[in-house]
């Protein structure tokens, strides 16, 4: 994620390493968004559950990416499912710890937020391109 030393220090006190087996879920839609994952190795699919239980992969996250941005915005609930497509190693960060540290040092909180907003922007752009692919670039108007 390209974080500076101050942000690394902030993150170090809030997280621990986790291993997620292939096909296991990091979280499910509607659950409490109480953590953030920094993917170190592996592949995670972000999925929407459609009618009849069908799943639509809206994005994938690889090494260096972030999974779980919903901890930033109340009501702190997941709006997607996150599934490890292959064995995945990540740093799991506690959201309450991150919010407390960001409140205590707004400068570091701002640096972290800048990087996370960049991740959000990339996801939004990927979704936009996916919609153009599905629905076409032209309108019938």
Residue ranges and their predicted role:
Residues 23, 34-47, 63-65:
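Glycine- and acidic-residue-biased ligand/ion/polar-headgroup-sensing regions
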Residues 26-31:
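Short phosphate-coordinating micro-motif centered on Lys-Gly-acidic
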